C-alpha cells in the first residue's frame, strides 16, 4: 500500500519522500549553478519546478542563500 511504502521509505532514508525529493532537486540545482552558466529559470525547470520564485524560496530555505548568491559564492 501507499502508506506502507511511505513508511519503508522514511525508515530507510530518515525523511519522507517529499523532503527527499526537494533535497535531491536542490542538490542538482547547486551542481548546475556551480558547473554551468545557465539562467536560474532554466535550472529551475531542469530540476522540476515550474515557478521560479517558488524554486528560489525553496533553494534559500535549504541553503540560506538565493541561487544567484550561491552561484557567486563559489561554494
Which role does the model predict for each range below?
Residues 11-50, 72-75:
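Terminal helix-turn-helix DNA-binding modules in bacterial transcription factors
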Residues 1-2, 50-51:
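Short coil turns linking two alpha-helices in DNA-binding domains
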Amino acid at each position: 500500500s501507499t502508506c506502507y511504502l511511505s513508511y519503508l521509505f522514511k525508515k530507510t532514508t530518515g525523511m519522507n519522500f517529499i523532503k527527499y525529493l526537494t533535497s535531491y532537486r536542490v542538490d542538482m540545482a547547486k551542481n548546475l549553478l556551480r558547473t554551468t552558466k545557465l539562467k536560474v529559470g532554466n535550472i529551475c525547470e531542469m530540476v522540476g519546478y515550474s515557478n521560479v520564485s517558488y524554486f528560489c524560496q525553496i533553494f534559500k530555505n535549504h541553503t540560506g542563500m538565493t541561487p544567484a548568491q550561491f552561484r557567486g559564492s563559489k561554494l
